[in-house]
Amino acid sequence: MALLPILEFPDARLRTVAKPVEQVDERVRAIIDDMFETMYDAPGIGLAATQVNVHEQIIVIDISENHDEPLVFINPRIDVLDETLFDYEEGCLSVPGFYEEVTRPRHVRVTALNRDGEEFVLEPEGLLAVCIQHEIDHLKGKLFVDYVSNIKRQRIRKKLEKQHKERA
């Protein structure tokens, strides 16, 4: 396993729309393993392949305190089950150090493939539903900062660009 570099906003590669995984094989499972290692090391609770410059529809999530409930979503499809919206303060490994409230559906249904290529359906609510929606957005080239005002987004962009220059 290997730690993968995480792309940071405003990197244009984060806007790439991910392609479906055609076959779940050892190559894909190796990407998944590297993504989990990278996510846990960051530390984070979710990571989309787009964030590590792999433009395939792969998501890893683990919202547990002890990192013992890993979830893999390959080629996820999402349906809203409850139109009730709620606000949740979100952060992102690709937008480090920033947290903003985002409004999302409370209850969704996700259909995806697991790490063995088997289809499954999950109907999460709360934090897991938010996390899945956030990561699926990454696969579509969308970031949580797209949900905030243009002024806030530009402020975040400028601060991160300044940090990138200071690290260079």
From Swiss-Prot:
Gene3D superfamilies, per the entry: Peptide deformylase
Active site, UniProt feature: E135
Record's keyword annotation contains Hydrolase: yes
InterPro entries (UniProt xref): Peptide_deformylase, Peptide_deformylase_sf
One Pfam family in the UniProt entry: Pep_deformylase
Domain of life the protein comes from: Bacteria
GO biological process per UniProt: co-translational protein modification; translation
Amino-acid positions noted as binding Fe cation in the UniProt annotation, renumbered to this chain: C92, H134, H138
Cofactor note: Binds 1 Fe(2+) ion.
Entry function: Removes the formyl group from the N-terminal Met of newly synthesized proteins. Requires at least a dipeptide for an efficient rate of reaction. N-terminal L-methionine is a prerequisite for activity but the enzyme has broad specificity at other positions.
Family note: Belongs to the polypeptide deformylase family.
Protein name: Peptide deformylase
Organism name: Teredinibacter turnerae (strain ATCC 39867 / T7901)
